[in-house]
Amino acid sequence: MTAMEESQSDISLELPLSQETFSGLWKLLPPEDILPSPHCMDDLLLPQDVEEFFEGPSEALRVSGAPAAQDPVTETPGPVAPAPATPWPLSSFVPSQKTYQGNYGFHLGFLQSGTAKSVMCTYSPPLNKLFCQLAKTCPVQLWVSATPPAGSRVRAMAIYKKSQHMTEVVRRCPHHERCSDGDGLAPPQHLIRVEGNLYPEYLEDRQTFRHSVVVPYEPPEAGSEYTTIHYKYMCNSSCMGGMNRRPILTIITLEDSSGNLLGRDSFEVRVCACPGRDRRTEEENFRKKEVLCPELPPGSAKRALPTCTSASPPQKKKPLDGEYFTLKIRGRKRFEMFRELNEALELKDAHATEESGDSRAHSSYLKTKKGQSTSRHKKTMVKKVGPDSD
């Protein structure tokens, strides 16, 4: 019992001491309220960046707009980042490929070159087609009849030639996109690049996602009548995942500083390993088609079917043989069969000669043949009847 009494006495002594200590500490506190405001509590509990991440853009705009009520200066919201492009975007706008010289007589020209195997770039005038090797320089001449206004630009863009592929954007294949063959200025997915120019701009349209390269227009140098721009094509026409053997067109446009069209011209392009060979082959096929199927006059219908066919030329008929042969046949049935076959062949020859205008001579020939066949028939019958009668 003495131990319990001692413990109770200790508690009774400690309680007043603890109360006095707490009251003394409470008096030492400042009179102002140290509790933070509701806005400060929100900042302590959740940072603004994390709050925007969880609440979304609408909530983030609402939270950021709260302190703006106290500030008389209104803050404009920042620009919204565009959505990333799909790997193979489709364009809703197809550029025109029709030639338009405009007020400045804008048109293209190319250097004359042959079809040797060693040539790296060659142009075919009848096909209006450029044959070149991968990543080889192709000079293109810009001709004008009058000087364009200051600040004019030249744009080059590639599109697919066939109507079923026109809406698709022309770009390099995945293999060549990963190749480190650029100078860092051109994006890896761009097909056309410019060589020998200090101010090329590689652009991608935000709406159509089409690639183009733009350079400032420079007037011809002294003693020259045209301006030359050197282009390169960074993917083969046969690459899978890229052009995939689909023909393409390169559209060259002359624009002013505001982007208004001043002139347009285009040409077909084939990027291959042997440009001279491919040009020679395609020109030969083009000439054969012109001989077999000539072009329709301008006033005729566009969808009219060609009258010519690609059938082989008719074979020349051999002249009839004028010699006669005698054939001895044993048995009447066999003789009648050969006789009918011979008459059918003679009748066929008679029709053939009538078409060539020699029907009279052949009709007399047919009569003589029939007379000889009947006389031979009588002779053979006499020979057969002779032994039987004996």
UniProtKB/Swiss-Prot annotation:
Annotated consequence of substituting A135V: Can cooperate with an activated Ras to transform fibroblasts
Region of interest: Required for interaction with FBXO42: 110-233
SUPFAM superfamilies: p53 tetramerization domain, p53-like transcription factors
CDD domains membership: P53 (cd08367)
Omega-N-methylarginine modifications at: R330
Modified residues (N6-lactoyllysine): K117, K136
Annotated segments matching region Interaction with DNA: 270-277
Chain residue ranges for the region called Required for interaction with ZNF385A: 97-297
Intervals of motif Bipartite nuclear localization signal: 302-318
DNA-binding positions: 99-289
Region described as Interaction with HIPK1: spans on this chain: 97-367
Region described as Disordered: spans on this chain: 348-390
This protein's record includes keyword Endoplasmic reticulum: yes
Basic and acidic residues composition bias: residue spans: 348-361
UniProt PTM comment: Phosphorylation on Ser residues mediates transcriptional activation. Phosphorylation at Ser-12 by HIPK4 increases repression activity on BIRC5 promoter. Phosphorylated on Thr-21 by VRK1. Phosphorylated on Ser-23 by CHEK2 in response to DNA damage, which prevents ubiquitination by MDM2. Phosphorylated on Ser-23 by PLK3 in response to reactive oxygen species (ROS), promoting p53/TP53-mediated apoptosis. Probably phosphorylated on by CDK7 in a CAK complex in response to DNA damage. Ubiquitinated by MDM2 and SYVN1, which leads to proteasomal degradation. Ubiquitinated by RFWD3, which works in cooperation with MDM2 and may catalyze the formation of short polyubiquitin chains on p53/TP53 that are not targeted to the proteasome. Ubiquitinated by MKRN1 at Lys-288 and Lys-289, which leads to proteasomal degradation. Deubiquitinated by USP10, leading to stabilize it. Ubiquitinated by TRIM24, RFFL, RNF34 and RNF125, which leads to proteasomal degradation. Ubiquitination by TOPORS induces degradation. Deubiquitination by USP7, leading to stabilize it.
Keywords: Acetylation, Activator, Apoptosis, Biological rhythms, Cell cycle, Cytoplasm, Cytoskeleton, Disease variant, DNA-binding, Endoplasmic reticulum, Isopeptide bond, Metal-binding, Methylation, Mitochondrion, Necrosis, Nucleus, Phosphoprotein, Repressor, Transcription, Transcription regulation, Tumor suppressor, Ubl conjugation, Zinc
Glycyl lysine isopeptide (Lys-Gly) (interchain with G-Cter in ubiquitin) crosslink site(s): K27, K288, K289, K348
Ranges for region Interaction with USP7: 356-360
Crosslink feature (Glycyl lysine isopeptide (Lys-Gly) (interchain with G-Cter in SUMO)) location: K383
Entry keyword Oxidoreductase: no
Compartments, as annotated in UniProt: Cytoplasm; Nucleus; Nucleus, PML body; Endoplasmic reticulum
Region (Transcription activation (acidic)): 4-45
Family: Belongs to the p53 family.
Protein name, per record: Cellular tumor antigen p53
Taxonomic lineage from the root: Eukaryota, Metazoa, Chordata, Craniata, Vertebrata
Gene for this chain: Tp53
